[in-house]
């Protein structure tokens, strides 16, 4: 809802300021194609979420994969038969166009993962407020400012290959640097500020590379398409951004929780609900007698009600000194598991960017420009 006022102002401004343009010869919109595309993407998201949340429902996973595959194949076949397809797949035969789309998907995929991973990690482990963790994650966008502004100027001097593939490679390096910043005390309890220098440096470096890529990906997509496909190319560009963000939240978000479930080692006597998510573990810690440390105390007011007293087992239900000690052990176990899953997700982002850099470097010739 925070975006509603901004959208309302933009809509009013467009209504009164933007000139109206109509194309009497516009291609007809094909509703069945849109439905098939929506069904294929929705099934893909459902399959990803099902596969990354143990215990895996094999029946639901198989149904989602089969539905997505059938809908995707039906969409492709329909586009090949239509005189005015919703998506002309021949556009992807142009290397610059394909590289631009891949670059756009890679950037938005990684950006979504960074925003989610950093904000979640520094809220649940380091005790940051949502505003503080959001501002920390936004350092990535600060890094994109110089390269995204200057990318268009550099394009005619160094070409698409260095900007798209090179930008993705620099972004991967930044992700690796950022993944090393886990602020922990020697005692094992998380610190609020240690290691932030590495994180900020890594996010700035990643932003610098991703900004260079995204600044020219649009140029590569639109200018590589024939004039009569310019509108379709613009639509593909927008879908690439949205598809990357969609995959990021569905895959990396689910993986963040799924890996936590795999990595967490619960102390004896702790309710199994603590293995579902770190918020559930913190809820149990708080319910055992308020054992949350000072830097996490404010989270106790906002935790979801995932457990109640009858759900506690062993000494955690006693509310005594032993309960508080076991709660402290659960806290460290949960935070350690979440940090491990966070690190894996950050490294996976670096791997995705490295793969994107290699593929786009193969697609594009040295000093190639969009044409």
Predicted regions, residues:
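Hydrophobic transmembrane architecture of multi-pass small-molecule transporters
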Residues: 185-194, 243-359
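Symmetry-related core transmembrane helices of the 12-TM Major Facilitator Superfamily/SLC fold
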Residues: 2-14, 36-37, 64-68, 346-360
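Interfacial helix-cap and linker-helix signal at transmembrane-aqueous boundaries
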Residues: 48, 122-123, 154-155, 255-260
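Transmembrane core module of solute transporters
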Residues: 2-4, 32, 59-60, 71, ...
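Residue-level hotspots within transmembrane alpha-helices of multi-pass secondary transporters
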Residues: 42, 149-153, 216, 246, ...
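Helix-loop-helix hairpins in multi-pass membrane proteins, especially solute transporters
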Residues: 1-33, 59-62
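Membrane-interface helix caps of multi-pass small-molecule transporters
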Residues: 16, 46, 77, 149, ...
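Phenylalanine-glycine-rich, low-complexity intrinsically disordered regions
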Residues: 22-23, 38-61, 77
């Amino acid at each position: 809802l925070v975006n509603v006022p901004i959208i309302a102002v933009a809509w009013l401004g467009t209504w009164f300021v933007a000139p109206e343009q109509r194309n009497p010869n516009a291609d007809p919109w094909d509703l069945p194609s849109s439905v098939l595309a929506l069904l294929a993407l929705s099934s893909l998201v459902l399959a990803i979420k099902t596969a990354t949340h143990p215990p895996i429902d094999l029946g639901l996973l198989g149904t989602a994969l089969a539905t997505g595959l059938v809908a995707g194949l039906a969409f492709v076949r329909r586009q090949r038969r239509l005189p005015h397809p919703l998506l002309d797949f021949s556009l992807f035969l142009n290397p610059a166009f394909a590289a631009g789309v891949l670059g756009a998907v890679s950037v938005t995929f990684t950006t979504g993962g960074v925003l989610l991973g950093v904000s979640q990690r520094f809220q649940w482990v380091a005790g940051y407020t949502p505003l503080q963790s959001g501002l920390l994650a936004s350092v990535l966008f600060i890094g994109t400012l110089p390269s995204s502004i200057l990318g268009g100027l550099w394009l005619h001097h160094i070409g698409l290959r260095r900007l798209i593939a090179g930008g993705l490679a620099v972004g991967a390096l930044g992700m690796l640097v950022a993944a090393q910043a886990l602020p922990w005390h020697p005692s094992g309890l998380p610190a609020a500020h240690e290691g932030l220098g590495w994180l900020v440096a890594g996010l700035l470096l990643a932003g610098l590379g991703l900004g260079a890529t995204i600044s020219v990906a649009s140029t590569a997509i639109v200018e590589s398409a024939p004039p009569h496909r310019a509108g379709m190319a613009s639509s593909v560009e927008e879908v690439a951004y949205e598809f990357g963000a969609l995959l990021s939240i569905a895959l990396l978000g689910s993986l963040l929780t799924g890996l936590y479930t795999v990595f967490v080692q619960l102390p004896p006597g702790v309710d199994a609900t603590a293995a579902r998510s770190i918020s559930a573990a913190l809820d149990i810690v708080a319910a055992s007698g308020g054992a949350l440390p000072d830097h996490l105390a404010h989270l106790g007011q906002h935790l979801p009600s995932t457990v109640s007293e009858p759900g506690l087992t062993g000494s955690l239900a006693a509310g005594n000194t032993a309960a508080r000690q076991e709660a402290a052990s659960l806290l460290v176990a949960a935070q350690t598991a979440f940090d491990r899953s966070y690190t894996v997700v950050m490294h996976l982002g670096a791997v995705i960017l490295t793969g994107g850099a290699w593929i786009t470097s193969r697609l594009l010739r040295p000093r190639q420009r969009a044409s």
